Amino acid sequence: MTARIQMVFGLLLILLGGLIYLSFRPTTLLLFHALDRMGLMLLITDWRAWMSAYHPTEFVLYSLPGGLWAAAYILIILSLTGRTPLTQRVAIASMIPLAGIASELLQWGGLLPGIFDATDLLCYTLPLLFLIIYVIIKNFRIWQVFSTASVVSN
């Protein structure tokens, strides 16, 4: 995947997570106060009225945006750090998902305010897991190993 495609997908994931927030989350969130100060609440109110026919699940409302944003961060960092050594790229790209995982685990242990949610933990973990699998497949040419093994065994 090229850096440009990674960036585009990353920006689309940010947009999708943002649209979920704008469409369905309570307007008491800090985001809406900022949008109100920018004079955008009339537009947002109209958008929310149009979207009111839809009733997404709690997973979509509360867990999915974090996972989308974690995945977006990974993709954008990978696109911006193309000439950086692989270990540094992975370390930087892992920061946000690891922070999300840590915050959920600390909530579970009662060491951080908030409510532990296993689906939030899953949504932060999956993008990181996909990153690791992607790096293994791309950089260690694992598919070549499998195809070579199948040719040798025949």
Language model segments and positions:
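Bulky hydrophobic segments
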Residues: 1-154
